[in-house]
Amino acid sequence: GLVGSEMCIRDRHTIVLEGGILCPGFVDAHIHLESSLVTPKEFVRATLPHGTTTVITDPHEITNVMGTDGIDYMFQATEGLPIDVRFMLPSCVPATPMDESGANLDYRAIDSFYDYPRVQGLAEMMNSYGVIHNDPEVVSKIVASQAHHKKIDGHAPGLQGKDLDTYVAAGVYSDHECATMEDALAKLQRGQFIMIREGTAARNLEALAPLLTPQY
């Protein structure tokens, strides 16, 4: 008989659509949901009709104001919504040491949140200087995320050379801030995933479109 003719694929789970329509949805891989200035429920009302079915949000803005209470609120407010809301935990609260924010979160403050099933990892590590120069608090946050087998998003526009080598080697696996092909290629060559954005505030599709070839 034909090679593989004895192979059989068995379903594990069957969903009866009962006349429904099955279609793919968009995934927004990086967002600060609270930046929309509406509640998560209202955000879903605006985005779901346009095909967005999953968002991965970093609640660092509300956390800069409310501390861990802000994270708790976002978890509760996104339960049971028709959009799948996943979380990356804020890595830089405050965003800089000069900020007068409502909270100062070290790795201990966010560590327990890794047990939440919708948490995917550590959000954009904006403190590239701290990563490169082995800042103990920054390293502790990275190590804690890795200990939970979670991903670490990056935020390092224009970082090059040995500094970029160090940043990526620390475990930062993605970047959404590439504005030029040179920047994107340097990070791709080191194994990072590159996000292409064409939204209201950030647009790099035209600059990075040449990446969308079989070569890359």
Where is each model-derived feature located?
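Active-site mouth loops of central-metabolism enzymes
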Residues: 28-39, 94-107, 173, 177
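A structural micro-motif
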Residues: 12-13, 20, 83, 150, ...
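Divalent-metal coordination cores built from histidine and acidic residues
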Residues: 41-149
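Short, small-residue-biased leader/transition segments that mark boundaries at the very start
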Residues: 2-9
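Histidine/acidic residue-rich metal-binding segments in metalloenzymes
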Residues: 104-124, 130-196, 200-216
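Acidic-and-aromatic substrate-binding clefts and catalytic sites of carbohydrate-active enzymes
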Residues: 36-38, 63-65, 201-202
